Swiss-Prot record:
Pfam families: DUF1516 (PF07457). Signal peptide: none annotated. Its main location: membrane. NCBIfam families: PRK13673.1-3 (NF010196). This is UPF0344 protein OB1184. The chain crosses the membrane at residues 3-23, 33-53, 62-82, 104-124. One of its GO terms (cellular component) is plasma membrane. The keyword Transmembrane helix applies. Keywords: Cell membrane, Membrane, Transmembrane, Transmembrane helix. InterPro entries: UPF0344.
Length: 124
């Protein structure tokens, strides 16, 4: 499940960048198609993340539970910011504050996911 979650995140970030570039170039129709595919990836990301969070709750108990829940909330925050940035770009609205939130959420997710929680790089 961990590999599926990381793969879906990687594909999600790639599709996010492609959609951003297309919106900036003014290719609205292809950008909307990529955006819809990205929304399907969001569903996969949320489902696999929920399963991983449930595994943490069941298997590791209280010492790690707080960090697992913060990572889950930061992951949801990151998905929400990706969606809001793309929607703002499509409508031509400023997205500076959303980019700041995206950066903070991304750092939280990477640090907690890869370096603090079990199943990350430090626990292999």
């Amino acid at each position: 499940m961990t590999h599926m979650h990381i793969t879906s995140w990687a594909l999600g970030l790639i599709l996010f960048i492609i959609a951003l570039v297309m919106y900036k170039k003014g290719n609205q129709k292809p950008a909307k198609i990529i955006h819809m595919i990205l929304r399907l990836m969001f569903i996969l990301i949320i489902i696999t993340g929920g399963i991983l969070t449930w595994d943490y709750i069941q298997g590791y108990g209280m010492p790690i539970l707080g960090e697992a829940l913060v990572k889950a909330l930061a992951g949801l925050w990151l998905v929400a910011m990706m969606e809001m940035i793309l929607t703002g770009k499509a409508k031509g609205k400023p997205t500076t504050a959303k980019w700041v939130q995206f950066s903070i959420a991304l750092v939280l997710v990477i640090v907690l996911g890869f370096f603090r929680l079990p199943m990350g790089f430090l626990f292999i």
